[in-house]
UniProtKB/Swiss-Prot annotation:
Spans through the membrane: 11-31
A GO molecular function held by the record: proton-transporting ATP synthase activity, rotational mechanism
Name listed for the protein in its UniProt record: ATP synthase subunit b
Subunit structure: F-type ATPases have 2 components, F(1) - the catalytic core - and F(0) - the membrane proton channel. F(1) has five subunits: alpha(3), beta(3), gamma(1), delta(1), epsilon(1). F(0) has three main subunits: a(1), b(2) and c(10-14). The alpha and beta chains form an alternating ring which encloses part of the gamma chain. F(1) is attached to F(0) by a central stalk formed by the gamma and epsilon chains, while a peripheral stalk is formed by the delta and b chains.
Organism: Leuconostoc citreum (strain KM20)
Main location: membrane
Gene responsible for this protein: atpF
Biological role: F(1)F(0) ATP synthase produces ATP from ADP in the presence of a proton or sodium gradient. F-type ATPases consist of two structural domains, F(1) containing the extramembraneous catalytic core and F(0) containing the membrane proton channel, linked together by a central stalk and a peripheral stalk. During catalysis, ATP synthesis in the catalytic domain of F(1) is coupled via a rotary mechanism of the central stalk subunits to proton translocation. Component of the F(0) channel, it forms part of the peripheral stalk, linking F(1) to F(0).
InterPro entries to which the protein is assigned, alphabetical: ATP_synth_b/b'su_bac/chlpt (IPR002146), ATP_synth_F0_bsu_bac (IPR005864), ATP_synthase_B_chain (IPR050059)
Length: 169
């Protein structure tokens, strides 16, 4: 056969050839048990770790996106609340301003009414004093007139004065 003729041509004894083949096969079995098994195990573990890391990175990316969306939502809510607080403060300030204006207007109205009342009282007092003065003056004039005889012109002047006094009242 092929193997025997080749061996004869190379002058390698058959026993040596069998020993080399068996040694090679034993070496392959030992390598498979000692090196290939652990090597494939390490490679499988490495592939699993890479897969786990990729899944973890994807999960972290998704969580980061969710947190970013949540932060954006919270920021929008905070801005809306700040806008509402500012609007409420403006409305409150406007209400206080309106209330102060109303109080000031009411106070001014009260002061105006009091001034009108005081003016009316002063006017009435002045009229009463004037009446008293006119009465006193009339009595004085009458007493002087009684002391002297009235002429026609004096009588006419007295009547005109009396009529004009009545018209002013």
């Amino acid at each position: 056969m092929f193997g025997l003729t080749t061996l004869a041509a190379n002058k390698l004894p058959l026993g040596n050839m069998l020993f080399i083949i068996i040694s090679f096969l034993v070496l392959m079995v030992i390598l498979k048990k000692v090196a290939y098994g652990p090597l494939t195990k390490v490679l499988d573990e490495r592939a699993e770790k890479i897969s786990t890391d990729i899944d973890g990175a994807e999960s972290a990316r998704q969580e980061a996106e969710n947190l970013a969306a949540q932060r954006q939502s919270e920021l929008a809510d905070t801005r809306q609340q700040a806008t509402k607080v500012v609007a409420d403060a403006k409305a409150s300030a406007q209400k206080q301003s309106d209330a102060l204006v109303a109080v000031a207007a009411e106070r001014a109205n009260t002061i105006n009414q009091q001034a009108q009342t005081d003016a009316e009282k002063l006017k009435e007092d002045a009229i009463a004093n004037a009446k008293n003065d006119v009465a006193a003056l009339s009595v004085a004039i009458a007493s002087k007139l009684m002391q002297k005889e009235l002429s026609l012109n004096d009588q006419q002047a007295l009547i005109d004065a009396y009529i004009s006094d009545l018209e002013t009242k």
